[in-house]
Amino acid sequence: MDKLFTPGKIGKLTIKNRAVLAPMQMMYGEHQGYAGEKAIAYYEERARGGVGLIIVEGVNVDEVNNKPWNLQMSLASDKYTASFQPLTEAIHKYDCRCFVQLHHYGAKSAPTAAGKAWAASEVPVAPGGPSAHKMTVEEIKIVEQRFIDAAVRAQKAGFDGVELAGSHGYLLHQFLSPYYNDRTDEYGGSIENCLRIYTEIVQGIKARLGKDFPVSVRFCGDEFTPHIPKTRTVEDAPAIARVLEAAGADVLNVSNGNNFNANANCEPYSYDSFWKAHVTRAVKEAISIPLIATNTIKDPLVAEETLEKGLCDFVALGRALIADPFFMKKAAKGDVVGIRKCIGCMYCREQLYAQLPVKCALNPRVGYESVYPLVPEQDGAGRVVAVIGGGPAGMQSAVTLAKRGFDVTLFEKEDTLGGTMNLADKGPHKEKIARFVETMKAEVERAGVKVLLGKAPSIDEVKALAPEGVVMAAGAAPIVPRIPGVDKPHVCTAYDVISGDVKVSGKVALIGSGITGLECAEMMLNEGCQVAMIEMLDAVGTGMFSVIINDIMSRIKPKDPTMYLHTMLTEIDDGYVMVKDVKTGEEKRIEADHVVLSLGVAPRADVLAEYRSAFKNVICVGDNAQRGRIPHATKEGYIKSLVFLKD
């Protein structure tokens, strides 16, 4: 990985390697807009982890005509500047450079006390939404000055450079996009005019801070919305890049997507690396200044390949460094398997959309770096602990306890560790989960955990260890309803199908449409089955993040399954099932050669009760505690094991 670890330059600024922490809203600011302990600890850990340049998430530049999200940090006035100095000092301790992104929501802002959100035109963010205030030329100059003033504050706070947030549907992008910009003055029409607000801000910053103060511009290379009229495509990207370079930008940071397609910049798991490489290449070939680019990079080998192909000069690592802040240090040692590689589950984005601080399914410490120690207290003193179950919660518990100095034995009834993740990675496009399983296996081994596979232990076998405590992580069992015919041989669970233990064909009645049910439906449709999806609720995927559901349904719907909503299974018989509309009471017979149950799981309460009656100190984590997902499993396994058997 020679190229990844070769120093690079942005203007006169030397960067120790080619990895950049991409700017991502984390919601780690203080309530008043200050940078506080939470943000400082988060960014310091990424600097400690070896990245060359950190671009701190977008900070607000306008408190009058822009309403930021909850917990967004701000450089909109001088009162905030001092709060960022500890942040830049913390980053610089590790020979890491830092920029800060300057941000304005534009039409995406909620109305402020001053009135409607300011934007390029009155076009609302989404059809039917509130219209924005079309800025006058005088108002554009006011906002430009607010960006420039924020850059001055950034320099005073110790930042090495700044970046303009000119992508992802925010104010500057609203000027660039013909969909939002219907102006006929000098700020609309041609690419040069649509970029005028960008170029005047860049030139204004240079005039105030000098030509050697680096300015990055993040812009949209392709909005990837062919169904929306008048949007930017890759054909526009080279011309956009050349205008920005001519204006004095020191580096460009190309991203993609807009308000109609955020998946183009924060992709679900179904997207592969290099899917948008053609955009990056088009920009790179058009400019002579350095280029930062995302490439759905979750693996250092992909980062190296991106650089080797000449697609960019610096690779932007976003969710990869949320999942594992030590990505670069591990890569430098060649420890690729030791990196917790983002699986694209979108839990981080799900939190953000709910206006909550970002969390990560794979990294339970993210956002809590100042609370949970990187190295836990060594208080195990060789005491014995048994962990029952080798899924994500069990493995995380075992590793955490071993790091505390406990003597840990992990029991797993299957022949390999991983638990339900070994099924989750079998669904279409879910191969990335296997990477996490392999990393967790490596962590278990490196922590010195004793692993016993292939048999569920008896109580006596566990007692023979004389454990001081037991961690129950035995998972959950599929729910099977008590209805006539459920025990017939053509009835199975979604787990049976996904694992490959049962092959189905012909007409299939799928009962339930949670995430597992939808993945099973996609698998069966891909194999040519005629699938009838039967769901008691009014929509499929209820309770799951809409982005993931929409991504899966975009592949399921074209295969034309039959869908029955607010419909309950009442009986199974040979060749058919009986269902009832829960709203009207109407009964219906649906032909089915196979019936696949996907009704969720229930904790193994009987196993838990047995262990609690046999041992004094028992904690329960993961699905064994409550039905959950990978983020719940890793968080419970980590946090509960940090405090288990404390004096």
Predicted regions and their residues:
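Generic beta-strand/beta-sheet core signal
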Residues: 22, 101-103, 165-167, 173, ...
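Flavin-dependent oxidoreductase catalytic cores
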Residues: 1-388, 392, 397-403, 407-408, ...
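Short, structured coil segments at secondary-structure junctions
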Residues: 287, 310-311, 447, 487, ...
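A short helix->loop->beta-strand "cap" motif at the edges of active sites that frequently abuts
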Residues: 95-96, 213, 289, 467, ...
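Rossmann-like dinucleotide/flavin-binding elements
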Residues: 301, 379-410, 452-469, 473-490, ...
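Rossmann-like dinucleotide-binding cores of NAD(P)H-dependent redox enzymes
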Residues: 407-447, 521-569, 625-628
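Flexible, Lys/Arg-rich cytosolic regulatory linkers and terminal tails that connect or flank
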Residues: 343-364, 488, 559, 628-631, ...
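Short gly/ser/thr-rich secondary-structure transition/capping motifs
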Residues: 1-8, 37, 366-372, 450-456, ...
